[in-house]
């Protein structure tokens, strides 16, 4: 490439320059090979002033805008969660774009109109799935419940629809028909009721043995879908289907394990179409029939049915739990074990008989028991306690054991004991049975820890005491042996012998002279320390100033300016 600069001689020197781009062949540039482009370069630093730049308008059309594909979900309710740029999706305008033959609006090769039609079809499919009538016919079951007069009446199980429809149906009707469901706005998918789930199922066998006119269906917290009644044209009122006295016994019997199995079978056999959304699947909870708040509310209500069940003598509560058959009445009654020692009292035979006489009027049958009522231990305590230990709480063992020992002395108890006192009586017997099974095994003597004796403390070594007579005797023996040794080796010409003889004689004759052997470490403390003296005193003792011993040393020390040169002496 070759660039030619055309500089203008103006006040702004070298401020405006034009660049001409030519072809690759510098010698013979061919016209038409490249488009002539004029570039204006402005250098404002020459003058420091701003100037307007005339820019050429871009005549070429703008490039095609890239459209980011936004995929909407199959249901309108989950669209805000799946598409983040819904507003941007509506702002795109492709009217100025020219569509080619091989070009489409989306990677799915579908136009915008087709996508909208597909979404509308999905919402209709989700709102009204096919097979709604068939599914409701197969899932809803009719239960035969005996009436007071012995006739049978068909009652349709209800569905628990956890939706805003519950608040709308809280009036006197408490029923929900198929027409009201179809009349709702099907376009608003979020406002629709979730998938139905069974809330309670009862069997006619349990109600038959109970002997009470209790209906298996009682729509309290959720509306009831009476489809068969709508077809017949006679919708029964909720007050006729069930009354307030049958609420607790009916719903409490729906918490049984047998009912849960029926719920699982119905939920597995149901043919509910899947519309591609998991919001409906998350609401399916057949196992959780009722919430904990409903259970607490039901047990707290004082109804005739629950009061009759609580008045059952609790002496047979243990045997009833063991010999209970599937055909017997299964109604969970919650009791609270009393941990107060004062409430742990025995029941006599007369009191138990009186309580049984009062309960004979109840319609709840008691299972047969071979043993007489009262605080009697079973024949096989170990086998009986294996079942008791699973139910008995651990915190009442110590208190109940002491209460049983005190209860053996008492032979009568008042008849106005509460239910909690009777429960304490029964649980106390169970604990005693479990205690009787345990055999106390004494630890063997081999396992007992033997106390060992501590080792004797070593006594401090004392210095041996030698008498003076014995010491003198040993000294003489040692000296005689040394002298004998010297006499044997007595040679006059030996220099060591002569030196030793001289030192011995000198030390004996001159007491001021000390033997060299006394200067050893053994006799060092015997020497007299010399008296310290000053330097002048030491000079006077050693000859005085007449001795020219320190002649030449200066009175004051002067450092030599050069090393190796001694300072000059005094003149």
Curated annotation (Swiss-Prot):
Stretches with biased composition (Polar residues): 299-309
Region of interest: Disordered: 270-312, 356-385
Subcellular location: Nucleus
Keyword Nucleus applies: yes
Biased composition (Pro residues): 365-378
GO cellular component, one term: nucleus
KW NADP (keyword) present: no
Keyword terms of this UniProt record: Nucleus
A GO MF term: calcium-dependent protein binding
Chief location bin: nucleus
UniProt cross-references to InterPro entries, sorted A to Z: S100PBP (IPR026097)
A Pfam family that the UniProt record links to this protein: S100PBPR
Bias (Acidic residues): 270-280
Name of the protein described by the UniProt record: S100P-binding protein
Organism: Xenopus tropicalis (Western clawed frog)
Lineage: Eukaryota, Metazoa, Chordata, Craniata, Vertebrata
Name of the coding gene: s100pbp
